[in-house]
Each structure stands twice: as structure tokens, then as C-alpha cells.
A protein has these predicted regions:
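C-terminal accessory domains and tails appended to enzymatic cores
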Residues: 21-175
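Short alpha-helices
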Residues: 1-23, 135, 157
Length: 175
């Protein structure tokens, strides 16, 4: 049940299927738990990052990608139900992202601060061409150095396809 709740962000991710909901419901009955309450406790415990370094937070859920054979970028993600916690993480991550860009072969870094309850993501970015890539991907301007992506919670189904398409569309504009 916990794995399904985690993978589907408590059934809010576009990756969630009817089978996920049915299986989680059946498992919750067997375990004798309330899914909503269990999910809140699980996400709260999983996102307790106060004692972690910016590096540990950044690489906790981080993946590298290559677009158009030459644009190397990395995307990390943290999901939380607590807006204050996400704001605190943001303050700690921005300076780290600056130092991390260029390491491990990536020239652009992105970080998703995903609010499960609001079903939205604040997308942090750093590196030459990263702002333009996100601007093309999401057809919007950043505000205070952040893209506020309403309805975007999935790196796999929403963020990466949009960034890949933007890389293809705007390759000559920001290489």
C-alpha cells in the first residue's frame, strides 16, 4: 500500500491508474488502515529533511537526462504536504544548485519542489539555457527565479517530456 501511495503521490499523479487505487484500497482493508491518514504520516516522515544536507536532499531523488544528443541536464525532486518545509528546502537548495551545475557532466540543473496537497511544483533551475528551456517547455515566465507549475507533479510524465520537447524546439536558441 505504501509503495502505491508513494509512487502515485496519494493518487494525485498522472501516473496513477484505477488498478493502483483498487489495489491500495484492498491492501488498506487487509492492513486495517485509513489510506488518507496513513499517506499523510508517510509523506511527513519521508520528507523530514531538517537534518539532511543540501547535497543529500538534492540527490535523494535525482536523475540525469540527455536531450538532442548534447544537452545534459539533471532533475531532482522532493514531494511534501508541507508548504513551509518546501520553502525551507528551496532556500537551502538554490546555492547548492549553483555549485552543482557543471559537475557530473550536466550543464543545467532543475529541482522540483512538489506540493502534494496543492498538486503543483515550484521548479528551480540553474545553468546556461535552463531558464529558456523551461520557458519554452511551460509557455510561461519565471517569477522570482522559479517556475510555478500548477498541476505538474510527475517528473516522468509531465516535466521531462515538456523539457525534451523544448530542447528539440529551441535547440538553436539556447545552445
Amino acid at each position: 500500500c505504501a509503495a502505491i501511495i508513494s509512487d502515485t503521490l496519494m493518487f494525485r499523479s498522472p501516473t496513477c491508474t484505477l488498478s493502483d487505487k483498487m489495489a491500495a484500497g484492498a491492501l488498506a482493508l487487509i492492513a486495517g488502515i485509513n489510506i488518507e491518514q496513513f499517506a499523510k504520516e508517510m509523506f511527513k516522515a519521508g520528507s523530514n529533511l531538517k537534518d539532511k544536507s543540501p547535497e543529500e536532499i538534492f540527490y535523494q531523488d535525482y536523475k540525469k537526462f540527455i536531450a538532442e544528443d548534447e544537452i545534459n541536464f539533471g532533475v531532482g525532486q522532493i514531494s511534501s504536504m508541507d508548504s513551509d518545509e518546501l520553502a525551507e528546502i528551496k532556500e537551502r537548495l538554490v546555492p547548492f544548485m549553483v555549485s552543482e551545475c557543471g559537475r557530473h557532466g550536466v550543464t543545467r540543473v532543475f529541482f522540483m519542489l512538489t506540493n502534494i496537497i496543492e498538486e503543483s511544483t515550484e521548479l528551480l533551475y540553474y545553468g546556461e539555457g535552463s531558464e529558456e528551456m523551461a520557458r519554452i517547455a511551460f509557455h510561461m515566465e519565471p517569477k522570482d527565479g522559479v517556475f510555478d507549475l500548477k498541476g505538474v507533479v510527475s517528473r516522468k510524465k509531465q516535466l521531462i517530456p515538456a523539457l525534451m520537447e523544448a530542447a528539440q524546439a529551441g535547440q538553436n536558441d539556447y545552445n
